[in-house]
A protein has these predicted regions:
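Dynamic "connector" segments at or just before major functional cores
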Residues: 1-160, 164-186, 190-219, 397, ...
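Structural motif
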Residues: 20-21, 52-61, 322-323, 373-383, ...
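Basic, amphipathic alpha-helical segments enriched in Lys/Arg and hydrophobic/aromatic residues
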Residues: 370-439, 445
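Short, glycine-/Ser/Thr-/acidic-enriched flexible segments
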Residues: 141-143, 182-183, 256, 311-313, ...
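Short amphipathic alpha-helical "interface-anchor" segments enriched in bulky aromatics
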Residues: 33, 80, 343-376, 381-396
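An anionic, glycine-rich sequence signature occurring as long contiguous blocks
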Residues: 2-12, 16-19, 250-364, 447-457
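An internal, acidic/charged active-site-proximal segment
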Residues: 180-314
């Protein structure tokens, strides 16, 4: 009779006499990246005039450590202790109480300076790993408040908390900007969208901003920018702001009565087959342009409306119009210059906006799932740190990691890279981080450190 092992782990004796062991060794990659990309120094300068006398710790360094801790999985200040107990890797890390003072000292002026500091570091990173075309995705999400917090309000989904809106660079997966709003903030608030757009453009390296100030001549543009949003961004004021900044847009549009009337004039032979990312035909989906059948003058010069129909999947919730037609319809407006047979490509590009849901989920996994403070101002500082955490993870993937880790989500990076244990050995005047040779991703982490030090000497 074959005997099977009925234990989930081996039996072992536990002692506390280990020496030179460090956990979360891979997280030091993010700290070193912040140093080499100039973020730590820029953060120090941003917090220089915060109004508090610091005898031991630099508040900018404290906030950088906080961002690294959030990237490592921290979701409250007490998790900061994980870095403090790894001084051989992270240096002199502040206590939780000192970190609290740094957060409390971060007012609106400091937040503006922090955004400039991150933009300066991004310029260095992008110079080392230039992205392709720039596509910015905008989306809002809901955060529940599980305790009393300033400016928490009832949400449209009958919850209670906040309704932040954020912008991400789809090309690099970086969070560019975010606005923390009360839970009752409107989804299609034009002023919020315009403010977020200004912050997102300001977060780009300086050469990418050229020609994108409101009123700039289009001939000044050096880098083409596309902004995508769902129908919450379909306001005339926001579209006007995008047009004035010479930015191409692709924004969801409601299927209203005017769209339905235009669709009734659309001929069957005018539909084109939708395509997949590899150029193959997407079965059961068709696209068309309704611009000739609608008055889009209120959306500005060059506005176009593209519609898509697809066979609904089982269980899909359809409108009365969709049920009568037998298809599910979606549409969006864009100011893309019209080219021959470009409708399927434009629809494919707009469909890529769905990736923003992954960005939002990863943002919540970087400290945003539950805002830790009662004060709204202090939660603004936490949101700023969470954006830096997301940027550090994205920069590491852009410049240091390869293979499947280059596209991995934060949870995967933590389990495989950031939380790995190691042994610190001193040899002469050199400090050596020894990784377990049996760990499947040890070589990937070693290559990441080598790439980091080669890219940012």
């Amino acid at each position: 009779m074959k005997v099977h092992n009925s234990r989930s782990v081996r039996r072992f004796k536990v002692t506390t006499d280990g020496k030179n062991l460090v956990s979360h060794a891979g997280t030091s990659l993010l700290g070193e990246l912040a140093d080499r990309a100039g973020l730590t120094q820029a953060m120090s300068e941003a917090m220089a005039d915060c109004g508090i006398s610091w005898n031991t710790h630099d508040p900018g360094v404290v906030l950088t450590h906080l961002a690294v801790a959030i990237a490592d999985g921290a979701d409250c200040l007490t998790d900061f202790e994980a870095l403090r107990e790894q001084s051989e890797l992270f240096g002199d890390v502040a206590s939780v109480s000192t970190a609290w003072r740094a957060v409390k000292a971060t007012a609106s002026l400091e937040l503006r300076c922090i955004r400039k500091a991150v933009a300066a570091a991004r310029e260095i990173v992008w110079a080392a790993a230039p992205p392709g075309g720039i596509t910015i995705d905008i989306d809002a999400t809901l955060l529940n408040a599980f305790s009393e917090k300033q400016d928490a309000r009832a949400t449209y989904k009958h919850g209670y908390g906040f309704h932040p809106i954020g912008a991400w660079c789809d090309t690099t997966s970086e969070p560019l900007a975010a606005i923390l709003r009360p839970g009752n903030a409107g989804s299609n608030d034009t002023d919020d969208h315009l403010e977020l757009l200004d912050q997102a453009i300001a977060a780009l390296p300086s050469e990418y901003q050229v020609g994108h100030e409101p009123g700039d001549d289009a001939s000044l543009v050096r880098h083409h920018i596309v902004v995508r949003a769902d129908s919450a961004g379909a306001s005339h004021g926001f579209v006007c702001g995008l047009t004035e900044a010479n930015i191409e847009y692709s924004i969801g549009h409601q299927i209203n009565s005017k769209v339905r009337e235009a669709l009734l004039l659309f001929q069957e032979e005018d539909w084109e087959q939708a395509i997949e990312a590899d150029g193959t035909v997407r079965e059961g989906a068709w696209v068309g342009e309704l611009t000739p059948f609608m008055d889009l003058s209120s959306w500005g010069q060059g506005a176009r409306l593209v519609i898509r129909r697809e066979r609904p999947h089982p269980g899909a919730q359809l409108s009365m119009f969709d049920m009568s037609e037998g298809y599910r319809h979606t549409c969006f407006i864009t100011n893309a210059v019209k080219l021959d047979d470009d409708v399927p490509a434009l629809e494919l590009r707009h469909r890529g906006h769905a990736r923003v849901e992954d960005r939002v989920r990863n943002w919540k996994d970087c400290g945003l799932q539950n805002l830790p403070f009662a004060s709204f101002t202090q939660n603004l500082a936490w949101v700023a740190a969470s954006l830096i955490a997301g940027s550090l993870l994205a920069w590491a993937q852009m410049t240091c990691l390869d293979g499947e880790l280059k596209k991995a989500e934060p949870k995967t990076l933590r389990y495989r890279i950031l939380h790995v244990a190691a042994v610190l050995v001193r040899r002469g005047r050199q400090l050596i981080l020894r990784l377990d040779e049996t760990w499947p991703w040890a070589s990937a982490l070693k290559r990441a450190f080598l790439r980091l030090r080669t890219t940012f000497p």
